Amino acid sequence: MPKEPETEYDPSLGRKFIFVTGGVMSGLGKGITAASTGRLLSNAGFDVTAVKIDPYLNVDAGTMNPYQHGEVYVLKDGGEVDLDLGNYERFLGEDMTSDHNVTTGKTYKHVIEKERSGDYLGKTVQIIPHITDDIKRRIREAAAGTDVCIVEVGGTVGDIEGMPYLEALRQFAHEEASENILFTHVTLVPYSKNGEQKTKPTQHSVKELRSIGLQPDILVGRCSDRLEPATKEKIALFCDVPTTAVFSNPDVDDIYHVPLVIEEEGLDQHVMERLNVAEEAITTTDRTNTWRELVTRERTSSVDVALVGKYDLEDAYMSVHEALKHAGIETQTEVTVQWVDSDEMLDHHEDRLREADGVVVPGGFGSRGIAGKLKAIEYCREHNVPFLGLCLGFQMAVVEHAQNVLGFADAHSAELQPETPHPVIDILPEQYDVETMGGTMRLGAHETNIDPNTLAAAVYNGTVCTERHRHRYEVNPEYIDKLEAGALSFSGQANNRMEILERSDHPFFLGTQFHPEFRSRPDRASPPFVSFLKSVDSTLDARSLNVSTSEEVQI
């Protein structure tokens, strides 16, 4: 149950709130716009946090289909949340908690529980004020101790699910001083066939927002190119905002360039002026130099990495993509990710993988595509291709070793083949009596002890790491001695649970039961991903050397 407020909220605290809504269509990039604004304010010296409102009835994102919703992002406290919170963490450099994700399921559940326990003293429980009050409470609690809280409202203005939230924001603005509240509306500005930027979708979206009682202070136009001056003027006229409050957010090749783009537009300066705050004595150029150097760092090499999974929606593996990108920044490597569908590669997996310089097998659930993942792991083991297995990828590396190295042909995971005579992967003991699905896995940050003088110790530069987990199955303790009889070893453990595996007969073969991608940041890349790319680079250098030597011999 959510914690109760420490004290009655005092609006005179002067905390600033930026509410980000979206119009015309979903998937416009509200989250990136919100996160980029937060990055710029953080650069200016403010303590910034973020809240994501998801108007669905699910309590959290844990049971949602990755095809529809993208990846389930895991927070340090075990919260299973929308992938936008991953963007907030990566842009702001802050670890969020479950309190930073507000869902209709959470809110209604809490209010109904209070009604059942008699907290409302016989009152008729309604959307207004009980649901809206709970929404406002959650936002204020998440913002505690910060200077600025950015709140993104999921979905599109006009969606029936979002109505209680927009009403709560209207009340919020009524309760706070006007200089403490700013509404940013992100909208689509498409091109017509004759190349004209069309403002009508934006006008209608703002009209819908105003009908609810909300007037945007800032309009951000998502478009393929920057908004023309005439377009900005037209939007300003019909949407009743100053021309100086209309900003472009054009398409970019790399989302980490968005803060630089909107800074050039002057959005951060406008926000600070509108909220009546003064940035620290840091010049605009100086406060973005570090971020600019980071995201524009020159790449000195390039690699192709095969990502072997079953969800063909890129967002389903967003954190893995971003972690590879972060590792590329640190190692100055241009990383091209090649999608390999594990469900369709059985007959031609060698052709698909031969072109890859390294292979990543990410997490997932269910039996579909497992045979393809096992083939990919076998290929990497036999051909000395750098391999990184995450969660399910770690478990399948254990299964592949048992089947093809130890000769247990029927070995498998009890999750995928319950009748297997050799369940080398079995359910966690504490999961035996669990009958519900949501929020019941082993979740969140846990510490792993690493054996010294191992690949894992070199990767983490130490003998302890803390990473985030999301799993219900583990390596079966009864098979550990058998599994370690060959070149495979478990070099990381947590309370007798196997957390990291590696192979002594391979240049780089690493598997982790945890998800290191969830803690990766642009300025603090995940150690397993950095070491993986370094190994890929080294392997390429060795191949190049062998080719050169071979050519010299032929000459």
Swiss-Prot record:
ATP binds at residues 27-32, 84. CDD domains: CTPS_N, GATase1_CTP_Synthase. L-glutamine binds at residues 67, 364, 392-395, 415, 472. InterPro entries: Class_I_gatase-like, CTP_synthase, CTP_synthase_N, GATASE, GATase1_CTP_Synthase, P-loop_NTPase. PROSITE patterns: GATASE_TYPE_1 (PS51273). Disulfide bonds: none annotated. Keywords: ATP-binding, Glutamine amidotransferase, Ligase, Magnesium, Metal-binding, Nucleotide-binding, Pyrimidine biosynthesis. Pathway: Pyrimidine metabolism; CTP biosynthesis via de novo pathway; CTP from UDP: step 2/2. GO terms for molecular function: ATP binding; CTP synthase activity; glutaminase activity; identical protein binding; metal ion binding. The active site is at residues 391, 515, 517. Mg(2+) binds at residues 84, 152. Homotetramer. NCBIfam families: PRK05380.1 (NF003792), PyrG (TIGR00337). Belongs to the CTP synthase family. Catalyzes the ATP-dependent amination of UTP to CTP with either L-glutamine or ammonia as the source of nitrogen. Regulates intracellular CTP levels through interactions with the four ribonucleotide triphosphates. CTPSs have evolved a hybrid strategy for distinguishing between UTP and CTP. The overlapping regions of the product feedback inhibitory and substrate sites recognize a common feature in both compounds, the triphosphate moiety. To differentiate isosteric substrate and product pyrimidine rings, an additional pocket far from the expected kinase/ligase catalytic site, specifically recognizes the cytosine and ribose portions of the product inhibitor. This is CTP synthase. It comes from Haloquadratum walsbyi (strain DSM 16790 / HBSQ001). The gene is pyrG.
